[in-house]
Protein backbone atom coordinates (compact mmCIF):
# COMPACT_ATOMS: atom_id res chain seq x y z
CA UNK A 1 0.00 0.00 0.00
CA UNK A 2 1.27 3.47 -0.86
CA UNK A 3 2.28 5.81 1.90
CA UNK A 4 0.21 8.95 2.33
CA UNK A 5 1.09 12.46 3.43
CA UNK A 6 -0.99 14.48 5.86
CA UNK A 7 -0.66 17.84 7.57
CA UNK A 8 -0.61 18.22 11.33
CA UNK A 9 -0.58 21.43 13.36
CA UNK A 10 0.21 21.50 17.05
CA UNK A 11 -1.89 24.46 18.14
CA UNK A 12 -0.88 27.34 20.47
CA UNK A 13 -2.36 25.72 23.59
CA UNK A 14 -0.28 22.55 23.21
CA UNK A 15 2.87 24.48 22.23
CA UNK A 16 2.47 26.57 25.40
CA UNK A 17 2.26 23.36 27.47
CA UNK A 18 5.59 22.15 26.03
CA UNK A 19 4.16 18.84 24.82
CA UNK A 20 5.54 18.95 21.25
CA UNK A 21 8.00 16.14 22.01
CA UNK A 22 5.31 13.95 23.56
CA UNK A 23 3.07 14.47 20.52
CA UNK A 24 5.95 13.70 18.13
CA UNK A 25 6.59 10.47 20.03
CA UNK A 26 2.97 9.47 19.47
CA UNK A 27 3.26 10.16 15.74
CA UNK A 28 6.38 8.01 15.50
CA UNK A 29 4.98 5.17 17.62
CA UNK A 30 1.99 5.10 15.25
CA UNK A 31 4.34 4.63 12.28
CA UNK A 32 4.09 8.21 11.03
CA UNK A 33 7.38 9.75 9.91
CA UNK A 34 7.85 13.51 10.20
CA UNK A 35 9.09 14.59 6.75
CA UNK A 36 8.85 18.37 7.22
CA UNK A 37 8.40 20.61 10.25
CA UNK A 38 8.48 24.26 11.23
CA UNK A 39 7.51 26.42 14.16
CA UNK A 40 5.89 29.72 13.24
CA UNK A 41 3.63 32.47 14.47
CA UNK A 42 0.70 32.64 12.04
CA UNK A 43 -0.44 36.05 10.85
CA UNK A 44 -4.14 36.85 10.88
CA UNK A 45 -4.14 36.68 7.08
CA UNK A 46 -2.49 33.24 7.05
CA UNK A 47 -4.96 31.87 9.60
CA UNK A 48 -7.95 33.35 7.77
CA UNK A 49 -6.77 31.93 4.45
CA UNK A 50 -5.93 28.50 5.89
CA UNK A 51 -9.35 28.19 7.56
CA UNK A 52 -11.21 29.90 4.69
CA UNK A 53 -13.55 26.90 4.38
CA UNK A 54 -14.99 27.92 7.78
CA UNK A 55 -15.29 31.66 7.01
CA UNK A 56 -19.11 31.68 7.12
CA UNK A 57 -19.28 29.63 10.33
CA UNK A 58 -20.00 31.38 13.65
CA UNK A 59 -16.75 30.15 15.24
CA UNK A 60 -14.46 31.50 12.48
CA UNK A 61 -13.28 34.67 14.26
CA UNK A 62 -12.59 32.82 17.52
CA UNK A 63 -10.71 30.09 15.62
CA UNK A 64 -8.52 32.65 13.85
CA UNK A 65 -7.92 34.60 17.08
CA UNK A 66 -6.88 31.38 18.83
CA UNK A 67 -4.58 30.24 16.02
CA UNK A 68 -2.68 33.56 16.09
CA UNK A 69 -2.50 33.70 19.90
CA UNK A 70 0.89 31.99 20.03
CA UNK A 71 3.33 29.93 17.99
CA UNK A 72 2.24 26.74 16.25
CA UNK A 73 4.24 23.70 15.19
CA UNK A 74 3.39 22.55 11.67
CA UNK A 75 4.49 19.19 10.33
CA UNK A 76 3.96 16.86 7.41
CA UNK A 77 3.49 13.23 8.40
CA UNK A 78 4.08 10.28 6.09
CA UNK A 79 2.95 6.70 6.53
CA UNK A 80 0.45 3.99 5.66
CA UNK A 81 -3.05 5.49 5.86
CA UNK A 82 -1.50 8.65 7.34
CA UNK A 83 -4.68 10.75 7.19
CA UNK A 84 -6.83 8.22 9.06
CA UNK A 85 -4.05 7.17 11.43
CA UNK A 86 -3.33 10.77 12.44
CA UNK A 87 -7.02 11.49 13.00
CA UNK A 88 -7.28 8.36 15.15
CA UNK A 89 -4.40 9.33 17.43
CA UNK A 90 -5.66 12.94 17.62
CA UNK A 91 -9.05 11.87 18.96
CA UNK A 92 -12.44 13.54 18.66
CA UNK A 93 -12.56 17.31 18.08
CA UNK A 94 -14.19 17.77 21.47
CA UNK A 95 -11.68 16.47 24.03
CA UNK A 96 -14.54 15.46 26.34
CA UNK A 97 -15.55 12.94 23.65
CA UNK A 98 -12.00 11.87 22.76
CA UNK A 99 -10.95 8.32 23.60
CA UNK A 100 -8.51 7.94 26.50
CA UNK A 101 -4.90 8.00 25.36
CA UNK A 102 -5.54 10.22 22.34
CA UNK A 103 -3.72 13.54 21.95
CA UNK A 104 -6.84 15.59 22.56
CA UNK A 105 -7.94 13.54 25.57
CA UNK A 106 -4.51 14.02 27.13
CA UNK A 107 -3.56 17.57 26.13
CA UNK A 108 -6.61 19.59 24.96
CA UNK A 109 -8.45 22.04 27.20
CA UNK A 110 -11.67 22.55 25.24
CA UNK A 111 -13.31 22.12 21.86
CA UNK A 112 -11.66 25.42 20.86
CA UNK A 113 -8.24 24.85 22.43
CA UNK A 114 -8.06 21.26 21.24
CA UNK A 115 -4.29 20.88 20.85
CA UNK A 116 -3.99 19.71 17.24
CA UNK A 117 -5.28 20.03 13.70
CA UNK A 118 -5.09 17.22 11.18
CA UNK A 119 -6.12 16.98 7.54
CA UNK A 120 -9.45 15.19 7.11
CA UNK A 121 -8.91 13.82 3.58
CA UNK A 122 -6.13 13.20 1.07
CA UNK A 123 -7.43 16.10 -1.04
CA UNK A 124 -7.36 18.51 1.91
CA UNK A 125 -3.98 17.14 3.01
CA UNK A 126 -2.48 18.05 -0.38
CA UNK A 127 -3.99 21.55 -0.24
CA UNK A 128 -2.94 22.13 3.37
CA UNK A 129 0.62 20.86 2.84
CA UNK A 130 1.01 23.15 -0.19
CA UNK A 131 -0.26 26.07 1.91
CA UNK A 132 2.66 25.80 4.34
CA UNK A 133 5.44 23.95 2.51
CA UNK A 134 7.22 24.07 -0.84
CA UNK A 135 7.77 20.63 -2.43
CA UNK A 136 11.55 20.82 -1.84
CA UNK A 137 10.96 21.20 1.92
CA UNK A 138 9.57 17.64 2.21
CA UNK A 139 12.29 15.09 2.96
CA UNK A 140 12.28 11.52 1.70
CA UNK A 141 12.14 9.09 4.61
Swiss-Prot record:
Gene symbol of the encoding locus: ndk
GO cellular component: cytoplasm
One MF term in the entry's GO annotations: nucleoside diphosphate kinase activity
Active site positions, chain numbering: 117 (pros-phosphohistidine intermediate)
Assembly notes: Homotetramer.
Protein name as annotated: Nucleoside diphosphate kinase
Organism (species): Legionella pneumophila (strain Corby)
EC number of this enzyme: 2.7.4.6
Enzymatic reactions: a 2'-deoxyribonucleoside 5'-diphosphate + ATP = a 2'-deoxyribonucleoside 5'-triphosphate + ADP; a ribonucleoside 5'-diphosphate + ATP = a ribonucleoside 5'-triphosphate + ADP
Protein's UniProt keywords contain Kinase: yes
GO biological process: CTP biosynthetic process; GTP biosynthetic process; UTP biosynthetic process
